[in-house]
Amino acid sequence: MPEHDHRAVEETAVHSGEPSARTDANTPAMSNLDSVPAEPLTASARNPQTTPALDEPVTWPSKVFDPHHPPADELINECVHCGFCLPTCPTYLLWHEEMDSPRGRIYLMKMGLEGEVDRMDDTYVRHFDQCLGCMACVSACPSGVKYDRLIESTRAQLERHYQRPLLDRLFRALIFSVFPYPARLRALLLPMWLYQRSGLRWLLHRLGLLKLLPKQLQAMEALLPEVSLRTIFSSPLPERVLPQGKPRLKVGLILGCVQRTLFAEVNAATVRVLAAEGCEVVIPRLQGCCGALSMHAGREREGLRFARRMIRAFEREQVDRIAVNAAGCGSNLKDYGVLLRDDRRYAERARRFSEKCKDVTEILAELEPQAERHPLPLRVAYHDSCHLQHAMGVRSEPRKLLAGIPELEVLEVAEAAICCGSAGIYNLVEPVPAGQLGERKARNVSATKPDVVVSGNPGCLLQIESSLARIGKPVPTMHTVQLLDASLSGTWGKG
């Protein structure tokens, strides 16, 4: 079992009944978490979310959660502790620690909700921080436990009540002051290009100076995509693109933050493919960040502010569908109706908005192809993004579209349900487990001997490309719509 110097205290592992070898004897154990029962956990008769009788005093038993959308007791009690989630959980696969599995984290939520945890200390928070939020457990669960709702509620509570170490706070502040703001990201493109093309990057690697940086900054540097002058000086897409041939749908396009800045060619390809299939494409200029990174990190107020702005931007256009080409954004956009359920002004508007949101492959798959596909003689390894396959339930549509390209061979990757380690900002704030998962995914991808790796999420593409390079097996990566665009244009291999 690998050593993890960042884990101060470990609990008893349910699968073995033996104390963890990684327990630090010098660190005081958190009360009530020193020993975890190995038998199935029974539901408590106490339910803090039950409305008390009028003559009873209103009490709140939790010492770590406030009453604003804590992890819901009724959702917690749906877990029957069967263990079907364990083989699909990335952190459980790495460490085989019960408290780093969905089942264990749900037990920790229950303890916190029922007042059995005295304070939100480092050990308690660490188990939730190490969850990637990949939702593989949601797909695997036979009881239909909504772990996605539970971890989202828990993370919002952590952000409100737990003060992180100073360096962690500063690093997260850096991330959230840049990533959700496309204009700020764009301002960094020229410095990134100079860093890559001036020889400075090569020199720092050659001298080993990057190893002096904190692991989080090393991870951020390793994930930098190649920046070209074309990317820096690319023109914005037009606000409206007319369909080719008979109009079939009016589709709004979500530009994304990282997508429009570092992967502008993916958005351009998306517009061309949709137009070729008879879709009028509308791109509202006022759209900003969708709030996905914020919501997944527990920054609820910030995420909801972004969501309201996005809804307002698209309400001005009467579209049939709203296309998303970044799976992490898509899963959040489809949840607007739930996220804004308490907002009287936006609840219904959010519900209508979410109903229109689809991954671009869903929209294309529902349309019978009208544009000619040219052959692409390639072996393509398709990577299922977690938020696409688990959160949005989109698995067959990308494969159907790729199968429609003549001479293209789609290769299935082993452990397709296991996360690549990207997971939003996870590979930045948790670089060690993210790196282990990235290399595991890279080895599985490399085993298929592909010409190209294809996925529907920019974070996955960066993570897999970086991981393949790290194991010495570099392979080009592309978004699904880029491959479709190449087939429609017939320009593959023509320079």
What does each model-found stretch correspond to?
Residues 2-3, 30-35, 40-44, 48, ...:
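N-terminal glycine-rich, Lys/His-bearing helix-loop that initiates the first secondary-structure elements
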Residues 6-52:
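N-terminal intrinsically disordered, low-complexity tails
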Residues 47-65, 92-126, 144-173, 473-483:
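Non-heme iron-sulfur electron-transfer modules
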Residues 63-76, 117-128, 242, 275-277, ...:
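Short, intrinsically disordered, charge-biased short linear motifs at domain edges
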Residues 73-92, 121-145, 387, 417:
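Cysteine-centered iron-sulfur cluster-binding motifs in ferredoxin-type domains/subunits
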Residues 83-87, 97-102, 280-283:
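N-terminal glycine-rich anion-binding loops that anchor highly charged ligand groups
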Residues 147-495:
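Iron-sulfur cluster-binding electron-transfer modules in prokaryotic oxidoreductases
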